[in-house]
Structure formats: structure tokens, C-alpha cells
């Protein structure tokens, strides 16, 4: 009763396209388009999306370049679903001829737009060709990107509220957002430094969890780097901190130690999920060398433990070998550098004081805050030094040029208590030189401000300038007297103190020799040479200091460009040499600034194009990483020219592993009908693979894809008419609340009642089909599938009278494809032969007889009668004749 399986010949509309091992045959209708062969394109294929691809020419965007697919039609796992059906069907049933993007992701259709190469100066901003670069991103950096975007989005929301905002109010908003960005950067630095120190990154990063200690590919990649340590330190005992015991490094270091005959000690953290295989590996490593496994708390103090256990050994060197640890180290270094750039930008453009053309020394000191911390940490690690050592004085000089006044005073106090200092000559004020220096530094306005005002505004405009000028004059007077007193025959100036004195006197040569960076040189000139509060004078000072540097770095050039107002050049340099996020968020704040790169506060910014470009590039780079797709699309939605199109392209090319994720993408990001339909089709692919045929059909109905619904319906009628599918189909129809299951299928009569029957309900996830609703009346195969399901239900319920009426109505309305006529007519024989009831009237019987004669006289009768014997047809003829006679008598 339920087996409608006529033979499918080579010219039939095959759901998957007629596929052979090396070639796609002609005249095939491929369900999801994209016909291809190993060397040439197939003729007469029904390609839904237009265009075709060969194995050697699969151009993603239609302009330049090519992508090789390498027999891509056999890379699909979907092909495995139909192996069982190949015995029934003459031609192999394959589901989908794949084309692929360069990253191996599914590519369903050609891009909507060609994104040619653009530059910063384009009128409409523009963007580069879509890139597909899959990057491994640290979990902490992902969180950092999310925090950056939160602030970015807030800025866009505020900027979009009103274009007539008071310029000074906008400056204050931008200043606040600049400080927020900086706090996000500093928080990321602190968090990553803490994770690095304690080893908690092992629990946070995907690369450290569920890793394989015998991953041959990773071992092959890391071997040259680890081997270099053994070659570089052949005579030392190396202590390797390996991260997790589950990583490759305990095994790799042990193996290389045996090969190079070097001595090494391995320290690793315990496994999160120990198993027998790892335990065997640990025993093997322990037998080859020394392995120490620490718990989480112990590993956070690994350096102390290493010192306690191995501190007495000679020529010991500790090394962090874990690549994730080193990745953290690189990111921290980058963030430190980027935070300094941000501080300099904030100094000139984003602080409220910069808009009033004034700066304070504390703002300059903020620019080298991380340098100061690094210097203080290095001094702390070195421990207490001998005050009699000349290096002690050099240390004080370095602290002084960094503006660490409190630490300098502390060091001088220690020095004053040393025996040698007690015998120092007295100045005219009867104080030792060290005490003189302490008094001078204690009176510096920088300290007075922190004590009195706590960063508050001065009482009158030139208060700070007057205070600093007075301090400079007093310093010059006192220290000049000290040097003059040391020039006599009885007194001598302490040579160790002389560099410190010269720095306080503003000696440029001494300052330059002591400073380690460009910004330290600028800060020293402000503090000890010529104090200024003018932004204009500060810009000039930046230029002067830059000219004194013999070999300026790229970072120094970027600092200078901030001072010279060449913001387009600045942003290009940052974009070229720094992570893209820095240029993007700087350009955004500068773009919204009413006094930067604008003729008038409310006029269009000259940075519009470069901001557009940077947003586009950054959004694409994020969206290329599937784990950052959402945030990448968030940025792209603010790209005015082509942003939504780029989102559609990225969304449509995302591999869909879970239906929930697809629904989320549809709900949040898919903006065009083409993108939604491509996702529906990918979901249909997945459900077909899982043999969820009703759900697969439902996705195609959501996509309003009539041609594919026809092909899928035909396939299901030929191969999958089992009770499980019919039950699923019933469930599908019940979930679509506007389906009229009693459809009048006479499409030739233009019945108004039937033309209004649409599927517009919800799928399994309550997703609404928008304006693109599917018309059931446009698809006769689906109508027959639905009506045939009704027939099955009536038969199972033993409602034979209703069954016969419905069947005759279907024959009358020509709903049933001719290849199924004989099978359905033969299924009626038990009802025709019934002795108790008359199920077919006289008119019904004549209709069935005419259908039988029509199919017998058809030139395709041999095809329609496949697997049906002549005896079955004769039995049907006799049953119809007897029923006709019975109907006349009745």
C-alpha cells in the first residue's frame, strides 16, 4: 500500500543531480545548484544561483584570483545518506554538489557586490575584498574585544541622539569614553598579567583544555622553537615551566633532552581531567628525567618552589615554554604599547583640558605610567643595593627622569644615613647636598598638587605656571651655589650626585643620556627644563625632542604624528603597525570630536572616509573568526557603504552546526531575503543528512523555494514514504497553523479560495516567515504529498468511504503524477472487490477506468508500469468491471 517506487531513469528530475564517480551527467536538476565536474562544466544543468564552477576555477567574487575545489563534489558527508537507495534507483542519489570558500566553508551563492580594492581617500570610504582569515584568538582578547565594543556602541548611540549637541558637551562625552577605553585596556593588561603569573590561563584558554599531549602536528610545529633553547644553553640545567601536564611540552622537552643529552627539569600543573593514558605518559616522562607536577596553588608560586628545590644547583636557568604563556606575553606587550599611544592621543585630543589648550604635568606622567611601573618593579626585583655603589645613584637618576619623585626622596633618605654621606661637605645653608636635594624635591609643585588639590583645578589660570617658575628659580639658585662651593680648593662636588644635580638644573645632555624613551625625554624637559601648560608649546617640545633622537622607532614616529596634527597619517601608521582595534576606536572618537578635522563643529568630519574604511576592515577581520562573528557583524552594521551586504556574506558562509545558532543568526543578522534563504537551505541540508525529511521540507518551505520543494517532494514520494516520515509530515503540517489540508488542487481553475492558502506559521523554533510566504498551490508535488498523507491516514483509520472519495477527487483534479496512477489504482482493488460495501459509485468507477486506459495508452507506459505485472493490470480491469456492474445494480 505504501510503496510508490517506480524506477527512476537517466532523464528524470533527480533530486540530487545524476552523479557518477567522476562526472555529473547531463539533463540533471541539482537540488541546491552548482553543478560541476572534475574538469568541465555539465551541460543543461539547472543551477539555481546562476554561474558554475570547475575544479580549477572557482572565483569567489568574480574578479581576480581563483580557488581550487579539488573534486569538491565528493567531499560532502551528505552523500552517505543515500547508499541504501542506490540499489533501488538506477542513478546514484547525491544530495548536493558543494562549492567551497577559501577556508573550506560552504559557499552557496556568488557575492552580491564586488568589493574592489579601496584606499583611504575614496569618496565613499569603501572596503577591501572580503577576507576569510581564521585566527586563533585568546579568550581574554575576545572578552577585551567585547568590552571595547560595548563602549563603542554607547558612543554611537549617544552620537545618534542629536546632531545639534553643544560642542563642549560632546567634548566631555568623548573625554569620558576615552578614559573608559583606557580603563578597558589597562584592565586587560592587569587580568592577563595576573593569569600569566598564577597560571590560571590554563583554565581559561581553549588551547590548554582537552589538549592531546601526543599531538604530532603541534609537536612538529613547536619542536624547532624548543630545540633552540637546548642549543642556546648547552651547559646549563634548564628548568622548563610547561603549563598543563596535558600539553605537549612535558613529552616534547623530555624527548629533546634525551636526543641532545642535555639536563632539564620539567615543572607542570596537574591535569584537569586525568586518565590512564596520561598517567602512562607521565610515568614514561618521569623515567626519562625529572618531572615535578604541582597543583593549582603551587603552580602559581612555581618560581618560589623552583628556587627552594633547585636553587643550590649551578648554572640553572628557568624558562616558560608554554606557547599560550608566550602568547599572553606578546599580547601584554602589545597592550602596554597601545595604552601609551592612547594616553598620548588623549593628551592632545580627548582630555577636557586639551580643548582649552592646556595640559598638566600629571597628564604627561600618565603617558609613562607603565614605564614607571616597570622601572619600579625591576628595582624591587634587584633588591636593596649598596648605597656606596655608583649603580645606586644611576638608579636614582632613572627614577628622577621618570617623575618618580617620592621614590627618589626615599632613596636619598637611605643614602643620607650612609656613613659616607654624613661626612659630606655642607652648603651655605649648612645642609648636606643630599638633604638639599631632598628639600628641593619635596617642594616640587608636582607633589604640592597631589597633596593640596588632588588633581583639582587651580585657583586662578596661571597658578601652576607661577608655582613651577618659582620652583625652577629656587632650584637653580640653591644648586648653583652648591656647585660653586664645590669648585673651591677645600670642597669637592660628589661625582655620583652630579648627574642628579644636572638633571634638576635642566642639563639636556645629562637628561638625554639618562632617558630610555622618547616620552621620558619629553617629561624630563617639562619637569626640569621649561615647564609649560600650553598644548601648542607641548607640540613644539615633542618635535624638538624627536629631532634629538638618533634612531627613532616607529612608535616614536606615531607619538610625533599625534603632536603634528597629521591625523590621517597618524591613523594610517597605527593601522599599519598596530592592532586594528586601536586605529578603529581612535578614529571613531576623532570622527565624533566637534573641534578635530572639521571646518565647523557641526560640519562633516574629514575623517569620515578613513573611519569607514577602518570599521569595514576591522569588522571583516573579526567576522572571519567564527568565534568573533557576532562582534564583527556588530561593527560592520555601522559601515554605511556596504556594511549590511558584508554581514550577509559572512552570515551566509558560516558553517551551521546547530539549529539554535542558525536561528540566532537569522534573527539578529540576516537582513536580505537571499541570505535568509541560503541559511534555510543549509538547515535543510543538515536535516536531510539526519533523515529528518519533514523538517528538511519545512526549511525549503520557509525559503519559498518551489523548485527544490518539487525535487525533494518527488524524492520523498519515490524513496521515503514510510510511516515515520508521514508522522513527521503530519507534525509539520500541524505546526503551520494556516495550512488547509483539504486543498482544492485544480490549479487550472484559478480558485480564489485555494490561491489564498499559504504557509505562514512558525517552525519548530517559532521563527516567523516574513513577507516571502510560500504558496502551497504553486507546488503540485507538495500538494500531492500532503493529500497522499491524508489517504494513508484514512486507510489506517479504515475510513474506506472517505478514502475512495478523496482518491477519486485527486484523480479528477489531476493532482496525482501519472507515474503513481497504476500503483494507486491497484491499491484500490480490495475496495473494488468488497462484497459488503460499495465504495466507488458509478461515476467514480468510470473515472478510474478512464484513468487506467489513459495510462495504458501512454507512450511512457513501460516506465509507469515498472515492477507491475500484466496480471496485476488484468486483475484491476476485472475489479473495475465488477464494481461498475455492482454500482449499476445498487
Swiss-Prot record:
<comment type="subunit">
    <text>Component of the nuclear pore complex (NPC). NPC constitutes the exclusive means of nucleocytoplasmic transport. NPCs allow the passive diffusion of ions and small molecules and the active, nuclear transport receptor-mediated bidirectional transport of macromolecules such as proteins, RNAs, ribonucleoparticles (RNPs), and ribosomal subunits across the nuclear envelope. Due to its 8-fold rotational symmetry, all subunits are present with 8 copies or multiples thereof.</text>
</comment>
<feature type="repeat" description="5">
    <location>
        <begin position="618"/>
        <end position="619"/>
    </location>
</feature>
<dbReference type="GO" id="GO:0006406">
    <property type="term" value="P:mRNA export from nucleus"/>
</dbReference>
<keyword id="KW-0509">mRNA transport</keyword>
<keyword id="KW-0813">Transport</keyword>
<dbReference type="GO" id="GO:0017056">
    <property type="term" value="F:structural constituent of nuclear pore"/>
</dbReference>
<comment type="similarity">
    <text>Belongs to the nucleoporin Nup85 family.</text>
</comment>
<dbReference type="GO" id="GO:0031080">
    <property type="term" value="C:nuclear pore outer ring"/>
</dbReference>
<dbReference type="GO" id="GO:0006606">
    <property type="term" value="P:protein import into nucleus"/>
</dbReference>
<keyword id="KW-0811">Translocation</keyword>
<dbReference type="GO" id="GO:0045893">
    <property type="term" value="P:positive regulation of DNA-templated transcription"/>
</dbReference>
<keyword id="KW-0175">Coiled coil</keyword>
<feature type="compositionally biased region" description="Low complexity">
    <location>
        <begin position="59"/>
        <end position="84"/>
    </location>
</feature>
<dbReference type="Pfam" id="PF07575">
    <property type="entry name" value="Nucleopor_Nup85"/>
</dbReference>
<dbReference type="InterPro" id="IPR011502">
    <property type="entry name" value="Nucleoporin_Nup85"/>
</dbReference>
<keyword id="KW-0472">Membrane</keyword>
<keyword id="KW-0677">Repeat</keyword>
<feature type="region of interest" description="5 X 2 AA repeats of F-G">
    <location>
        <begin position="16"/>
        <end position="619"/>
    </location>
</feature>
<feature type="coiled-coil region">
    <location>
        <begin position="719"/>
        <end position="752"/>
    </location>
</feature>
<keyword id="KW-0539">Nucleus</keyword>
<feature type="repeat" description="4">
    <location>
        <begin position="61"/>
        <end position="62"/>
    </location>
</feature>
<keyword id="KW-0906">Nuclear pore complex</keyword>
<feature type="repeat" description="1">
    <location>
        <begin position="16"/>
        <end position="17"/>
    </location>
</feature>
<keyword id="KW-0653">Protein transport</keyword>
<protein>
    <recommendedName>
        <fullName>Nuclear pore complex protein nup85</fullName>
    </recommendedName>
</protein>
<feature type="repeat" description="3">
    <location>
        <begin position="49"/>
        <end position="50"/>
    </location>
</feature>
<feature type="repeat" description="2">
    <location>
        <begin position="32"/>
        <end position="33"/>
    </location>
</feature>
<comment type="function">
    <text>Component of the nuclear pore complex, a complex required for the trafficking across the nuclear membrane.</text>
</comment>
<feature type="region of interest" description="Disordered">
    <location>
        <begin position="59"/>
        <end position="86"/>
    </location>
</feature>
<dbReference type="GO" id="GO:0031965">
    <property type="term" value="C:nuclear membrane"/>
</dbReference>
